[in-house]
Amino acid sequence: VLDTNVFVSGIFFGGPPSQILKAWQKKSLQIVLSKEILVEYQRVADELSFKYPQIDIMPIIELITIHGQFIDTEGLDISICEDPDDDKFIECAVAGKCDIIVSGDRHLLKLVWHKGVKILKPRDFVDQYLRL
């Protein structure tokens, strides 16, 4: 599961978030998300596209819509994050039986680990899982 900051940073700014998206595009990893997460990805990417009009977000949004692994989180109500908006990432990871959430969000990173789900910064994820 990628939090919105990581997904959008991968599109607009490069660095480890971009490496993660490229690995996903090469099918080296799977991105798990919920409809609620996709809506947030789209909203934040749309906002940034006004600031960076040279970047076309539609191809990656279409790819994630088609090739992302969607998980139904309906009925789950995990309230653990300081910022309740971040709970959707925990819910998605738990429902999807994911091992990792990749996040730069301080509220999520404070948790470190929840119900078998590790929370890693993008650089740590790249170093631990994408380096050969």
Feature names for model-found ranges:
Residues 2, 14-46:
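PIN/NYN-family metal-dependent endoribonuclease catalytic core
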Residues 66-100, 106:
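Active-site neighborhoods of divalent-metal-dependent phosphate/nucleic-acid chemistry enzymes
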Residues 15, 32, 55, 80, ...:
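Residues at secondary-structure transition points
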Residues 96, 106-132:
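Acidic, PIN/NYN-like endoribonuclease modules and their adjacent C-terminal/linker elements
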Residues 54-65:
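Short, well-structured alpha-helical segments
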Residues 50-51:
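Membrane interface segments of multi-pass transport proteins and intramembrane proteases
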Residues 3-4, 33-34, 104-105, 121-122:
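A secondary-structure boundary/capping signal
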